[in-house]
Amino acid sequence: AAVARAEGVELWSDAHFEALRRTMKILADAGQKVITATLNKDPWNHQCYDAYEDMIRWTLAADGTWHYDYTIFDRWVELMLSLGIDGMINCYSMVPWNNELVYNDEASGSPVTVKAEPGTPEFERMWTPFLKDFKQHLAAKGWLEKTNIAMDERSPEAMDAAVKVLEKCAPEMGFALADNHSSYKRYTMMR
């Protein structure tokens, strides 16, 4: 979002992706190897001037099924891979700082914000269908083995709850974190 604002272009437009290419080329030339992507809107709860926008659009269909639009995510990952940033894809976050998830409700045509605290039925209800679908999408793209669900300085209790759902729904995926609790010692699927 910051690049779009600074360049005066529409978010996720062709012009935005071209501006991102120029900016990310600097990172690639400096040796960057990890792609950072968002699973939902603003996983860091607007800690920056520009909130992080969602790269995957979640929609609850009128019939109660979930649909996920990976168009922006795919384009972002493909851009980064084309620059040689290809070590891992770290996706933030199953435990966003505000524990909120945003989706489009097809029946009402409106966005909905849900509070999904780790360890609650709502958390599992929201993340189970997504992780199963995301895993299939990543496998089809050939990215499953390099993709991690990433968390940023979350409590051990919150991470335990998230890891439990991740291991149940997508055990093939890795796990990455910025850790301020020495939690890294607890997880075998760390990459």
Where do the protein language model's features map onto the residues?
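Aromatic-lined carbohydrate-binding surfaces of glycoside hydrolases
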Residues: 1-173, 179-185
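Structural recognition of alpha->loop->beta junctions
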Residues: 186-191
